[in-house]
Regions:
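Residue-level signal for cytosolic alpha-helical hairpin/rod architecture
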Residues: 23-24, 195
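Structured secondary-structure scaffolds
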Residues: 1-8, 12-21, 27-32, 38, ...
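Acidic/polar, glycine-enriched structural segments that form the non-catalytic walls/loops
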Residues: 1-15, 118-126, 130, 199
Length: 199
């Protein structure tokens, strides 16, 4: 941490609140304790995936409600695409409900674009939080489509060593200098494993 944190290298902190990982990890635990409504929750959770494979990071009240990033700061966490697939696979293994992959879900939309590197200047909050077609209708895709977009976009976002970029590294709040050149061998292997499972 001494070389990865620009401020107080011996200090860890948390921001609180319920985020993307919490959402999917809650589903994982509910699969073991109260599996009845987990399929419906999983379907709604996929509405937090953007069309570029990134995800909403703030969870609103109730299932399927997502909020743009705090303070208007574009954030992309490189591990976010792992959780939906891990959870959905366990759900299918536990229930046999393979048809969940064919169910439709919308895509989240806010001003963040191009995997958090640009702002969509044409987006207006009045448009709502869903990706729309050129005709103004909410675009939906299968859950399988959501999974493929997430996995492929994350897998191909690599750094100078052809390893997945670390991006924000927010699961370790002591690293705030990883966004430029940080890479993760562990998550590269995890995404490769997810792609093998999808194949």
């Amino acid at each position: 941490r001494l070389f990865g944190c620009s401020f107080l290298p011996h200090h860890d902190y948390g921001r609180g609140g319920r985020g993307w990982r919490d959402l999917w990890q809650d589903c994982l635990s509910l699969l073991l304790m109260e599996p009845g409504d987990v399929g419906r929750m999983i379907e709604k959770n996929f509405g937090g995936v953007r069309i570029d494979g990134t995800t909403a990071t703030i969870i609103g009240a109730g299932d399927g409600n997502f909020i743009a990033d705090r303070n208007g700061i574009a954030r992309v966490w490189m591990d976010h695409a792992l959780w939906p697939q891990m959870t959905t696979k366990l759900y299918i293994d536990q229930t046999g409900d393979v048809e969940i992959l064919n169910r439709q879900a919308p895509y989240f939309k806010d001003a963040q674009a191009v995997r958090g590197t640009q702002i969509d200047a044409e987006y207006q909050p009045e448009q709502g939080g869903w990706q729309r077609t050129s005709q103004g209708e909410v675009y939906t895709g299968t859950i399988l489509e959501h999974l493929l977009i997430e996995q492929l976009a994350a897998f191909y976002e690599v750094g100078e060593h052809n390893i997945c970029r670390l991006r924000g590294a927010d699961w370790n709040d002591a690293l705030d200098m990883a966004a430029e050149r940080g890479e993760s061998v562990a998550f590269t292997c995890a995404y490769a494993g997810n792609l093998r499972e999808l194949a």
